[in-house]
């Protein structure tokens, strides 16, 4: 079903969003179209959206209340994701899932209705209490129909690749002037070897660096604690004006448009 958007000022379209961490979104205040690999998934308000790590999406969303944030996001770091995966494998009696199988976008991005009581429990848990958060998420997943796809996606998201090691290295200091040579030295390998290993995973050094910089910039903008020039320096771009152009080219919106839409009240 297609959703008909109303006033343009209520909507935003953002391109090239790389999901670096397994993410669960709750569309508390928006209707969202998610585009990936020439497919579109429409998610209405008050739904959960499960986003597999590694997918690249574009989104178009419309707020219902302009002064509030459009959604609530739960992002799982590597340790949380592995613990969640291990627990689910035991609970549901699974040992291994084929990570090489051809999978459609509907198996990587899933939407579902959710019991508000369960969701409130998840939202109210202390963000630093990983065990309680994972336990609540497991319980929530157990109450969802057809949760096999979600469990499969969590398992696949937990698999680590060489490109993840490169990302982890760069993320330690995004302000550094990274080059392929620096990466090669860190892994005690040649630049050609690094390039080929990344190509085998359908990516490259420049793509990884740009995605990490833009993702970090977006998160820093949402924190509302830094000026544009500070954010630019924090992600390794010395010119604020150049950063604004790159951000706009990457996401299709300026940093100001991005911040204004997502900041909420």
From Swiss-Prot:
Gene ablation phenotype (knockout): No longer expresses CS1 or CS2.
HTH araC/xylS-type domain: residues covered: 164-261
SMART domains, per database record: HTH_ARAC
Compartment(s): Cytoplasm
SUPFAM superfamilies in the cross-refs: Homeodomain-like (SSF46689)
Cited InterPro entries: Homeodomain-like_sf (IPR009057), HTH_AraC (IPR018060), HTH_AraC-typ_CS (IPR018062), Tscrpt_reg_AraC-type_HTH (IPR020449)
Keywords carried by this UniProt record: Activator, Cytoplasm, DNA-binding, Lipoprotein, Plasmid, Repressor, Transcription, Transcription regulation, Virulence
Signal peptide from the UniProt entry: none
Chief location of this protein within or outside the cell: cytoplasm
Activity-regulation annotation: Rns-dependent expression of pilins and outer membrane proteins CexE-alpha and CexE-epsilon are inhibited in vivo by decanoic acid (decanoate); has no effect on expression of DnaK or flagellins. Decanoate relieves Rns-dependent repression of nlpA.
Positions with a binding annotation for decanoate: 20, 75
Residue ranges of DNA binding: 181-202, 228-251
Pfam families: HTH_18
A GO term from the CC aspect: cytoplasm
GO molecular function: DNA-binding transcription factor activity; fatty acid binding; protein homodimerization activity; sequence-specific DNA binding
Subunit structure: Homodimer; each subunit binds one decanoate molecule.
Task of the protein: A transcription factor required for the expression of the CS1 and CS2 adhesins of enterotoxigenic E.coli. Required for expression of pilins and some outer membrane lipoproteins. Represses expression of nlpA.
Comment, domains: Has been crystallized in an open and closed form; both bind decanoate which changes position between the 2 forms.
PANTHER family: ARAC-FAMILY TRANSCRIPTIONAL REGULATOR, RCS-SPECIFIC HTH-TYPE TRANSCRIPTIONAL ACTIVATOR RCLR
Official protein name in the record: DNA-binding dual transcriptional regulator Rns
Taxonomic lineage of the native organism: Bacteria, Pseudomonadati, Pseudomonadota, Gammaproteobacteria, Enterobacterales
């Amino acid at each position: 079903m297609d959703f008909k958007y109303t006033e343009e000022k209520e909507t935003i379209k953002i391109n090239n969003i790389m999901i670096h961490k397994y993410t669960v979104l709750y569309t508390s205040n928006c209707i969202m179209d998610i585009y990936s690999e020439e497919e579109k998934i429409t998610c209405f308000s008050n739904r959960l959206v499960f986003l597999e790590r590694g997918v690249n999406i574009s989104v178009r969303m419309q707020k219902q209340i302009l002064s509030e944030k459009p959604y609530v996001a739960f992002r799982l770091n590597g340790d949380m994701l592995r613990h969640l995966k291990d627990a689910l494998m035991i609970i549901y009696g699974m040992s291994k899932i084929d990570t090489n199988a051809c999978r459609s976008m509907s198996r990587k991005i899933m939407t579902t209705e959710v019991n508000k009581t369960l969701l409130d429990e998840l939202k109210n848990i202390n963000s630093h209490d990983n065990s309680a958060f994972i336990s609540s998420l497991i319980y929530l997943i157990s109450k969802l129909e057809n949760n096999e796809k979600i469990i499969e996606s969590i398992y696949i998201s937990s698999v680590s690749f060489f490109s993840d090691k490169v990302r982890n290295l760069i993320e330690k200091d995004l302000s550094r002037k990274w080059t392929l040579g620096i990466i090669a030295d860190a892994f005690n390998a040649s630049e050609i070897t690094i390039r080929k290993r990344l190509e085998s995973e359908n990516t490259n050094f420049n793509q990884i660096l740009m995605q990490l910089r833009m993702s970090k910039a977006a998160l820093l903008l949402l924190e509302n604690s830094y000026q544009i020039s500070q954010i630019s320096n924090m992600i390794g771009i010395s010119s604020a004006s150049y950063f604004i152009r790159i951000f706009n080219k990457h996401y299709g919106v300026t940093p100001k448009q991005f911040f204004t839409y997502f900041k909420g009240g």
